[in-house]
Each structure stands twice: as structure tokens, then as C-alpha cells.
Amino acid sequence: MRIDILSIFPEMFGPLNQSIVGKAQDKGILELHTHDFRENATNKQRHVDDMPYGGGQGMLLMPQPIFDTMDKIPQKPEKPARVILLDPAGKKFDQKMAEELSQEEQLIFICGHYEGYDERIKTLVTDEISLGDFVLTGGEVAATVMVDAVVRLIPGVLGKVASHEDDSFSSGLLEYPQYTRPEDFRGMKVPEVLMSGHHENIRKWRLKESLRKTLERRPDLLDKYEPNEEELKMLQLLRENVQDVVE
């Protein structure tokens, strides 16, 4: 995969050269490029923003520097890149979207600053995406998060496919609790079932705990989750237990 990031602060993406994303680059699985679109500004002061027509607060990113930067980024004519505009008004980013984007050959992220974008910039864009229902100073932090979430899903980046398939949200549920050595730490013991070696009992425990955590912390996820018969029975028991505690 090739990822291009347009930003006036390209130095903010240094962390993407470390850890999993850095290793993906070392393996040749990922090609990551940052582009300072200020370098393509044609005015003497190299401004990339200006006042909005019609008045209003703040400054808007001008189209020219971004268009000219995009013109210099190589793309395959037969399979153009997905071009993502980081915008708080965009569609909210989630695990399903990360999985979808990980299937692409090329992604381009445009990071905004100031009050917003000149509307004409959006003619370059295939997707407008938001990290969440809040406003950041710029799009760089959001782009970093999204790149990390996407790259780890590319085949060959993580050691085993199961490494990310068991992650929270990958199955539609939150991940079950996990433990490592020692068996007993300051009186806190590892659940016996996990040391039993009984794979079916371990599977059932993990599923139940995953459902329990989701029910307690993110019940909204269950609204769009389609449980099987086994999961329905577990959820019913968990809800009954919660009701007993309330009463």
C-alpha cells in the first residue's frame, strides 16, 4: 500500500516511522510519503489560507496549494487513490471503515487547519472522515490514528491474522479480559478456566466476558450486532444478573 499525507506540519508524522507502521515500511509492505503543501503556494508570503468570501470568523485553506500538491502525487489511472479529507463534519471513523480502507492500494489524507476548507477542495475527495464528535486543532492527529488503524490490518503487517481478528470491535464486540504471568499478583489471581487447558471452556468464558464487557461499557454496539443462539442465551443470563443487582 502507498499512503500520502498532505499537511503543513509533516514533522508531526514522525511516530509513523516507529513500531508496527515503521516495520511495515521496513518490510516493503507500506510506502509512506508526507507532502508539505505550503511548498506549493504561489503567493510571495507562501500563505495557504485566506479570509472567507461573505465574511465570517477564521481563515480557510486555499485550493491552489492543495490542488498543485495533488497534481504531483503519482496515482494509477486504472485505480485512483481513495482521497480522504479529515473533517469534523465527515463520517465517523470506526473499525469497519479501517478494514475497508486496508483493502485499498493507495490512500491520500488531506489534513486541514484553521477554520476549514475552500469548498472546491472537496472536488478532489472521495471520502470526508471524522475521528469523532469533537474538534481538533488540525487533521494531523486524526490522520495518524487512522493510518495506524488501517496499516495494522494489511496482510503481512502483524505476525498472525488472529492478532487483529480478536481485537475489540473486529468482531463487533469488545475484547475479553486477558492475563499473563504471574498466576497470582498481589492477591489478584488469573481465572482458573484459563489455566485448565480445556479449549471449549476457555472459548465459552472468553465469549461470555466479551459479551459482558460490551453490555456494561458499550451497549450501543449490541444494537447492530447479530448474536447467534449461544450468544443470545449468554446475553439473556447477563441481563438477568444485571437486573437482579439493580433490584
Curated annotation (Swiss-Prot):
Record flagged with keyword Lyase: no
Reaction catalysis annotation: guanosine(37) in tRNA + S-adenosyl-L-methionine = N(1)-methylguanosine(37) in tRNA + S-adenosyl-L-homocysteine + H(+)
Transcription recorded as keyword: no
Enzyme type, top EC level: transferase
Keywords carried by this UniProt record: Cytoplasm, Methyltransferase, S-adenosyl-L-methionine, Transferase, tRNA processing
Subcellular location: Cytoplasm
GO molecular function: tRNA (guanine(37)-N1)-methyltransferase activity
GO (cellular component) term, any one: cytosol
Binding-site residues, S-adenosyl-L-methionine: G112, L131, G132, D133, F134, V135, L136
Single GO biological process annotation from the record: tRNA N1-guanine methylation
EC number: 2.1.1.228
Role summary: Specifically methylates guanosine-37 in various tRNAs.
Subunit organization: Homodimer.
Family listed: Belongs to the RNA methyltransferase TrmD family.
Entry protein name: tRNA (guanine-N(1)-)-methyltransferase
Gene: trmD
